[in-house]
Amino acid sequence: MITIKKGLDLPIAASPAQVIHNGNTVNEVAMLGEEYVGMRPSMKVREGDLVKKGQVLFEDKKNAGVVFTAPASGTVVAINRGEKRVLQSVVIKVEGDEQITFTRYEAAQLASLSAEQVRANLIDAGLWIAFRTRPFSKVPAVDATPASIFVNAMDTNPLSADPAVIINEYKNDFEYGLTVLIRLGVKVNLVKAAGVNIPTVDGITVHEFAGKHPAGLVGTHIHFIDPVNLTKTVWHLNYQDVIAFGKLFTTGELFTDRVVALAGPQVKTPRLVRTRLGANLSQLTTGELNVGENRIISGSVLSGATASGPVDFLGRYALQVSVLLEGCEKELLGWVMPGSDKYSITRTVLGHFRKKLFNFTTAVHGGERAMVPIGAYERVMPLDIIPTLLLRDLAAGDTDSAQNLGCLELDEEDLALCTYVCPGKNNYGPMLRTALDKIEKEG
């Protein structure tokens, strides 16, 4: 077992009850284009087209063979694009239950499948995009082979669901999915929380992690178990995609159910809800929120994406929906107040010393300014890197030094705590993405 000593468990109120309920019915779903790093779509549908569940919506021009399939049957009501015609979303109004079927196997056949059979079925069904690479966090090429595959079956994000509750709901499908992964012919690492009982199968290497967030992030797992570099790549996926793999191979149908944590200070009844991949989040949260100007987040409060307008949908990789009150109100002479209702990792407010949960808002309590190296980054960074120097290089655009300091091991979510504790209010995620894009381009 690996225990993480550095990090931060954000003391935020309204964690979800770990019991699964059915969520609101949604009649719109979407595929979000900006989730897929470096993807350039070749559209296979137009607005007004009728599509079946599992039908190809678009293909990646830059990654031949990688297709993105419809999460529901219905009508394509919008294809939203942003600046420079970047694809934001393909929105489907859910109608009927027509679907495309894929190759089906008996459970007893799964352990004898070839790697080619596994790849072909995942690619055809559009489930190949469940894999992401490290470094760069991109969907892998269909003919690529990683050094290993990581299945993340733990979650330490604030307000997250307990993966064990969901996995045990789909125990057999999870085991089938693990069996399918083994047939790809590379080492499969299953990472779970210490002491938690979840199913596994022969051939899987099980690891346990304990400690504060980010103990549950896949970047932490990769760093300690099988570190990557510019010439070594690993893949990772989450436990709900493993369940979807198992469903696909034993039923021949695309499984698009998602169980997500609906939580946060503005949620009336925080709990786990069953919905569908790409669900419209305004519809999912109807009647669920307290009065106020709320920000709905697809994902964690630390690293999720604001869901509104053309991207008001559950992300492909999101396992939670978080809701915070917009922090619009200004506080007169707030800087001289003791701050008993505020939290900080430093001893600058009284709330630091109080063992309580806080109703966080989106307010950042200050404007962006220069980095201030007061040791805050080191307190929340458990990886074997020097965070202050790395963040300085990312801010300065020095990719050579950033690469030497370990930026290739990271994704935006791995720097989310550094962003949160930064006295200068700097957002390091976009800086990291800019550096990674430049490193990949320059080779």
UniProtKB/Swiss-Prot annotation:
The protein's GO terms of the molecular function aspect are:
oxidoreductase activity, acting on NAD(P)H, quinone or similar compound as acceptor
Signal peptide boundaries: none
Q: Does the keyword Ribonucleoprotein apply?
A: no
The GO annotation for biological process reads: sodium ion transport
Under which EC number(s) is this enzyme classified? 7.2.1.1
Give the transmembrane region(s).
none
Task: Spell out the reaction equation it catalyses.
Answer: a ubiquinone + n Na(+)(in) + NADH + H(+) = a ubiquinol + n Na(+)(out) + NAD(+)
Q: Which UniProt keywords apply?
A: Ion transport, NAD, Sodium, Sodium transport, Translocase, Transport, Ubiquinone
Q: Which Pfam families match?
A: NQRA_2nd, NQRA_N, NQRA_SLBB
Homology family = Belongs to the NqrA family.
Q: Which HAMAP family match?
A: NqrA
Function of the molecule: NQR complex catalyzes the reduction of ubiquinone-1 to ubiquinol by two successive reactions, coupled with the transport of Na(+) ions from the cytoplasm to the periplasm. NqrA to NqrE are probably involved in the second step, the conversion of ubisemiquinone to ubiquinol.
What is said about its interaction partners and assembly?
Composed of six subunits; NqrA, NqrB, NqrC, NqrD, NqrE and NqrF.
Record-given protein name:
Na(+)-translocating NADH-quinone reductase subunit A
Species name for this entry? Answer: Haemophilus ducreyi (strain 35000HP / ATCC 700724)
